[in-house]
Amino acid sequence: GAVSGLLTNL
């Protein structure tokens, strides 16, 4: 999902 994508970028 969108949130998971942002977290993996960190």
From Swiss-Prot:
Keywords: Secreted
Intracellular or extracellular location(s): Secreted
Tissue spec: Expressed by the skin glands.
Source species of the chain: Limnodynastes salmini
Protein's recorded name: Dynastin-6
One GO CC annotation: extracellular region
Principal location class: secreted
